[in-house]
Amino acid sequence: MKIKAKKSLGQNFLVDRNVINKIVEAGNILPDSVILEVGAGTGNLTESILEKKPKKIFIIEKDEKLVEKLKERFDNKIVIIPKDVLKVSEDLISTSKLIVFGNLPYNISTQILSKWITNDNQNNWFENYILMFQKEVADR
């Protein structure tokens, strides 16, 4: 069954292997790295992250159909948090500094970034962010 991106959730799935590889390389993932991936979609980025063998991968995914697809694809190799990223408290996840990957939805990109910057300044949760935005968000 082919999954279609939901415009209402601002979904845009990564499929270009070259782009995915560049994103993963930018993360400098080590064996003790703890990863947070926001909106894993169909799991193409997740698969490449797993090849680097990080300590743990947390995925926040709101779309119930994608959550099921990710569970089927990755079994117990990842921890899925089936919630809206804006409603997740990072202290539920953070046992060490996180490397955050995300192809952020246009409609909530600014809110997510503001939340993370504010929380990180207070709690120092994040080691690195590798985020993709639509050009319109970056221009703002």
Q: For the regions a protein language model found, what residue spans apply to each?
A:
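Catalytic cores of RNA-modifying enzymes
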Residues: 1-140
